[in-house]
Amino acid sequence: LSRKDKERIFEQKMSPLYISVHTTVPVLRQELLENPKARPILEEIAEMTEHHIVLHTQIVLCPGLNDGHYLTKSIQELADCYPGVESLAIVPVGLTRHRANLPEVKTVDAHYARELIALVYTWQERFKKTLGEPFVFAADEWYVIGDVVFPPLEAYGALQQLENGVGMLPLFLETFEKTDFSEPLCAEEPTRFILVTGTSFSSFLTDCLKKVRCDNIEFQVLTIINHFFGDSITVAGLVTGKDIINAVLENRTHRYSRSVTRGETKGLDVLLIPEVMLAETKKDFLDGTTPQEIEAALEMPVHIVPADAMGFIETLKILAESPRDRLLDHFVMDEHSLDEGSLMDNGLGMVTGPRALWRAER
């Protein structure tokens, strides 16, 4: 952040802020960011907290680089900054296919994920005694990779780290579980909602939709393989527009069509895209494709829907009645999202986070 940015934060008391730390070890952090001039992060944090700016922090964990004793040091030093630093999210690195001539970074596997979850749990128990709060949290993706059951929602405290993918999935699942679907969703004409998502969330979304009672409506969950960044990138927030177009076109011949015929009645296909797939401007995808271009290419109505469960459910109810109508743009960018951003291809070919906040540190 520039001096001008900081002065604006202090003057407007823009708190809390979300910042990417990755490690508190100065030399290692400079290497990770490929920025030999990067100021020690603990100095940056001290300056912020001295001005009464509360911080939520994130570590993108890269096996073999900033884990082990480096991670232990980072967790403890960030906890020492509590309550100025209110929480810490640990997120697994995602490796893009754009990694020619870059340092080797190991892929996160199930065994590694389970070990990380166990480590975080140990730290949480310690911090509950010393700070009265869990403080450190493992992102949902660790549980997906490790095939580990999510902890109860109350284990996530005030859910301060939703933006970093901590508690998003458990919250989505619990909201669906508690929603009353006794009244079925009804459509005047047979309607097929095609819902696109990344591979991480696909099975969860499919299970959730089984709870929804429908009349004249069916759901199809279409898993989008990320060809743009590489198939190891599984989160919905990094899916691109062209990958959506190609996936729908490839599957249309045997599953989808513009007008689905059921007996003598023609139906309608409608594509639903979670807003988390749009870039920070909310106008296009990370590859520059716009929702309008997707609609033109596929010749079907396209709707951008909320990523949170309650907003998604309410939008489904509206679309069930009028699937051809255009929804109002409901996206409002939070001015407090002036964070250093989720790490995007910082020279290590690393991306992370459920959302597309693409402000890489340099």
Question: What function would you assign to each model-found segment?
Answer:
Residues L1-G84, L95-W123:
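Conserved Radical SAM active-site core
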Residues D80-C81, A89, G94-R362:
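Auxiliary Fe-S-binding modules of radical SAM enzymes
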